[in-house]
């Protein structure tokens, strides 16, 4: 089950370009050819809500363009309604395990996860909180090429964090990567009070350092689900 469901991280069968191009052009108000100097029509990753393309801006910057599937907000609402019905039925027969709070949390998060403006703003806030760390990469957002359903950001050229063999082949110290990842999330949660709340392998990359001998960095993407913790909660 884990192996099969893990495909949802970034290996969902992609939607055809003919279906996704109109989303970009409608959201950004121009043709793809005018908006970007280059745009690869083949998606480099596809997940449950959107798929990602590689492109290049007119100034030569390599970017990733995240495009939401048409009609996904309505589908999410339909799925949540179905889940609500199921957990309400479950609650009539099961008194020990109550799944209703889980669906409550999903319903609170859903509007933010399908709003890429929220995602971009969250990425910028976390980047500001971690600006003193040189072991993490968070993509810059290009707001003139972004909207609620399209998000253009720096392309992070990294190795999926679960691909340990590729990391070792690149000469990366994998135990040190693990230490960095733990320290990074401890910093976000316990010190800075805002953290990336969806750290599955499709959202975490290991980026070899350009400086020889320096440790690899952690690349974080997809800030659609972030959480903020009050000071009092963190202190407790």
Positions of PLM-derived features:
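Conserved catalytic-loop position in the HRD/HxD motif
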Residues: 193, 198-200
């Amino acid at each position: 089950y884990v192996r099969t469901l893990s495909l949802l991280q970034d290996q969902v069968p992609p939607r055809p370009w003919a279906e996704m191009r109109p989303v970009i052009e409608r959201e950004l108000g121009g043709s793809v050819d005018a908006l970007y100097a280059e745009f690869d029509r083949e998606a480099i990753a596809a997940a449950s809500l959107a798929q990602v393309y590689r492109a290049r801006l007119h100034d030569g910057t390599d970017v990733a363009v995240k495009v939401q599937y048409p009609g996904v907000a309505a589908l999410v609402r339909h799925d949540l309604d179905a889940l609500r019905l199921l957990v309400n039925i479950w609650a009539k027969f099961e008194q020990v395990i109550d799944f209703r709070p889980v669906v409550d949390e999903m319903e609170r998060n859903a509007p933010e996860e399908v709003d890429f403006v929220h995602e971009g703003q969250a990425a910028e806030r976390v980047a500001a909180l971690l600006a003193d760390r040189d072991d993490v990469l968070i993509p810059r957002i290009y707001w003139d090429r972004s909207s609620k359903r399209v998000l253009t950001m720096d392309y992070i050229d990294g190795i999926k964090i679960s691909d340990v063999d590729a990391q070792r082949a690149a000469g990366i110290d994998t135990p040190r990567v693990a230490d960095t990842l733990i320290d990074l999330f401890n910093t976000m949660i316990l010190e800075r009070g805002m953290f990336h709340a969806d750290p599955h392998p499709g959202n975490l990359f290991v980026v070899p350092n350009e400086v020889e001998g320096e440790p690899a960095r952690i690349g974080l993407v997809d800030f659609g689900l972030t959480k903020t913790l009050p000071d009092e909660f963190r202190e407790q």
